């Protein structure tokens, strides 16, 4: 059975970032999205290496996707057809697109967000029964109730 771990890093241009915290950020503070962008860039190679290492321990393929011609074409098409969709959301749709494409070659697929650092030697593919379908870690206990979301919070986390 063919197995793969994949991740991707799309360095969204600063001009396209969705500054969701602009109404609540303290004066002089770095917006969350910009800080995240900076930290991901600063730790880019370490974040790739830890995922490669995990895949190697499991004996599975690892594929890293980045801001390449395929993504540029995908984004261009998306912008043409859905101009109101933000770059951040296009990146999330691309994640699903990649999953679909990888499913043509691989039986079992693990997607890791770029900021995830595997901290176990246990095989995800042995621990989770993927024959039952998609595995999603549920964390709704950490979500804010809708009445606690304000125009200044803009998020459920």
Where are these regions (language model features)?
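GT-A fold catalytic core of metal-dependent nucleotide-sugar glycosyltransferases
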Residues: 86-153
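N-terminal anchoring/stem segment of glycosyltransferases
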Residues: 1-94, 104-105
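Conserved beta strand-loop-helix elements of the APE1-like EEP
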Residues: 156-157
